[in-house]
Regions:
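Positively charged n-region of N-terminal signal peptides that target proteins for export
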Residues: 1-6
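Boundary at the C-terminal end of the N-terminal hydrophobic targeting segment
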Residues: 22-24
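A general, composition-driven signal for non-globular sequence regions
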Residues: 19-20, 170
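Sequence context surrounding c-type heme c attachment/ligation sites in exported
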Residues: 26-85, 89-92, 96-208
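Bacterial N-terminal signal peptides
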Residues: 9-19
Length: 208
């Protein structure tokens, strides 16, 4: 009888011991270990998630002049509005992915340069690290602008969608001009003459 009792106590003790060891091996998020494990780089998030979801929003409303006259393009059916809503939601949530710490700007050896004055990935990373709060603020501005597109989509208001799309573009430009090409004066020059983000001439000046 005593042997069985001792065996039972021994078994319980081992169970507690292994439980303590297992608990000790779990990551302690409260001590600074991140609960997130980012895999994609910022460049990959931009090309794989941001661009494919923001372009349909920007292109959803337009005016095309032809020999036959002017063609107004805007979402018409519930299905078209629903498709745009999915893009807006994805854009809202990717803003959260952008601010996860530990995410590199680009993969080793990758070329991020799309403008003459753009910094190297290493220098962009340094700039973000030096002004983390500013980077997060820009990401939140993108999310706020994307929320405006969602509100316009839910209201099925094409005019408001155009305005919100311009604010999304402005948020993107603000972040890139601050961290990717801080020495590039072209966005400022185009704005100084009264052009707004989304204007075709603005984009020509921006990409020239």
């Amino acid at each position: 009888m005593m042997h069985k009792t001792f065996l039972g106590i021994y078994t319980v003790a081992l169970g507690i011991l292994f439980g303590v060891v297992a608990y000790a091996q779990k990551p302690d998020v409260s001590k600074g270990e991140s609960a997130y494990k980012p895999v994609a780089t910022l460049q990959e998030l931009m090309s794989s998630i941001v661009d494919p979801n923001v372009d349909p929003i920007w292109n959803s409303v337009s005016t095309i002049s032809t020999k036959e006259g002017t063609i107004e393009k805007k979402p018409q059916t519930d299905e078209e509005w629903l498709a745009l809503r999915k893009h807006a939601l994805t854009l809202i949530e990717v803003s959260n992915l952008l601010v996860i710490e530990g995410r590199p700007v680009a993969a080793s050896g990758a070329n991020t340069s799309s403008h003459v004055t753009e910094l190297s990935p290493k220098d962009i990373q340094k700039a973000i690290h030096a002004n983390r709060d500013g980077f997060v603020k820009n990401a939140h501005a993108l999310q706020d602008a994307a929320k405006l597109t969602l509100a316009a989509i839910d209201a099925k208001d094409a005019d408001e969608l155009v305005k919100a799309g311009g604010k999304v573009e402005h948020a993107c430009e603000q972040c890139h001009s601050q961290f990717w090409y801080p020495n590039d004066k072209r966005p400022t020059a185009s704005l100084d003459i009264g052009l707004k983000p989304g204007n075709s001439l603005y984009m020509k000046m921006r990409n020239s």
